[in-house]
């Protein structure tokens, strides 16, 4: 029997209708895995050995009672076959410390999804720089004058922090906007933090597409997140509506270009964000949108993931 651990935000507070981690747990349970539940505070390191206080878990598709804890035990993380790291951002120093603990278990043979070192290496906004020919024009800087020059060149830009999620603190700055200076100062904290600027992509009106990649293989359907009227952000957390649809030709091209690199880095479950034919983000920490896609199309994305995990464990 496969022993699967999951590190996640409190399960008591999730929305099971759209929670991807919950979908993963349902599929793992369907396959007869033993489920071990952990939150960040349950992980610890003693003399170099990664350990955790885990609770065995059963889940069900029931809006009144979707989980039940069984026994509680202190275990070596290496006693688990696989651990899903599904803690949502912020990607802060605490998150980084947790990846080091998980990496100690990985060195003893436990499969970590996604690979701890690659979680540290691949910032969701910045990692697109390794595929610059696929992205919008992009500037990463602390310098207000550079941001202003980029805005003057393009006339219509998006500015965002490097560590936001769910569309937080994303600004669209159009030609002639008198607020460019204060937005630059706010995002860079007066030149003390890096931020990102990209040329505005009108294709956002048709949605910001979440394309999932499982162990290097693109999922054939995506979720287009369409902004509300007057909004430039499609993120569901920012009020966008989700519309599942098949991948376009350019979606396939981008996912097939990026997929092999992700697989080689041990990034087994990744969400690409694509606007039109441009790659805008590579989400590696806790990608979502599985349930919305699975509700619309006859596909089991979590099944693809568990197949990939089983194949890696069999090696």
From Swiss-Prot:
SUPFAM superfamilies (alphabetical): Glutathione synthetase ATP-binding domain-like, PreATP-grasp domain
Entries under InterPro entries matching the protein: ATP-grasp, ATP_grasp_subdomain_1, Glut_synth_pro, GSHS_ATP-bd, GSHS_N, PreATP-grasp_dom_sf
Residues given in the record as Mg(2+) binding sites: 281, 283
Cofactor binding notes: Binds 1 Mg(2+) or Mn(2+) ion per subunit.
EC number: 6.3.2.3
Annotated positions binding ATP: 151-207
Pathway the protein contributes to: Sulfur metabolism; glutathione biosynthesis; glutathione from L-cysteine and L-glutamate: step 2/2
Gene Ontology CC entries for this record: cytoplasm
Domain ATP-grasp per the UniProt entry, residue ranges: 125-310
Keyword match ATP-binding: yes
Cofactors: Mg(2+); Mn(2+)
Keyword Ribonucleoprotein assigned: no
PROSITE patterns assigned to the protein according to its UniProt record, in alphabetical order: ATP_GRASP (PS50975)
Family membership: Belongs to the prokaryotic GSH synthase family.
Protein name listed in UniProt: Glutathione synthetase
The organism of origin for this protein: Salmonella typhi
Gene it is expressed from: gshB
């Amino acid at each position: 029997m496969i022993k699967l651990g999951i590190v996640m935000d409190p399960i008591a507070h999730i929305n099971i209708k759209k929670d991807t981690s919950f979908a993963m747990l349902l599929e793992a349970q369907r396959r007869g895995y033993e489920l071990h539940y952990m939150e960040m505070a349950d992980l610890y390191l003693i003399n170099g050995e990664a350990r955790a206080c885990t609770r065995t878990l059963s889940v069900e598709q029931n809006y009144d009672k979707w989980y039940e804890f069984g026994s509680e035990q202190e275990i070596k993380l290496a006693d688990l076959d696989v651990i899903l790291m599904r803690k949502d951002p912020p990607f802060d120093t605490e998150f980084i410390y947790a990846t080091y603990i998980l990496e100690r278990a990985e060195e003893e043979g436990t499969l970590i999804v996604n690979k701890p070192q690659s979680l540290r290496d691949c910032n969701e906004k910045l990692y697109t720089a390794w595929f610059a020919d696929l992205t919008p024009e992009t500037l990463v800087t602390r310098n207000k004058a550079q941001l202003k020059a980029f805005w003057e060149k393009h006339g219509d830009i998006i500015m965002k922090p490097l560590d936001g999620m769910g569309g937080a603190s994303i600004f669209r700055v159009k030609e002639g906007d008198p607020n460019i200076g204060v937005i630059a100062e706010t995002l860079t904290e007066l030149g003390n933090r890096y931020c990102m600027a990209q040329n505005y992509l009108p294709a956002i009106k048709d949605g910001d597409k979440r394309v999932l990649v499982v162990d290097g293989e693109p999922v054939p359907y995506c979720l287009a997140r369409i902004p509300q009227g007057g909004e430039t952000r499609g993120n569901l957390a920012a009020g966008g509506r989700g519309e599942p649809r098949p991948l376009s030709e350019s979606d396939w091209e981008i996912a097939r270009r990026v997929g092999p690199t992700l697989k080689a880095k041990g990034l087994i479950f990744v969400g690409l964000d694509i606007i039109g034919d441009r790659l805008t983000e590579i989400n590696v920490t806790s990608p979502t949108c599985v349930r919305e896609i699975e509700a619309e199309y006859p596909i089991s994305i979590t099944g693809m993931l568990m197949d990939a995990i089983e194949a890696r464990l069999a090696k």
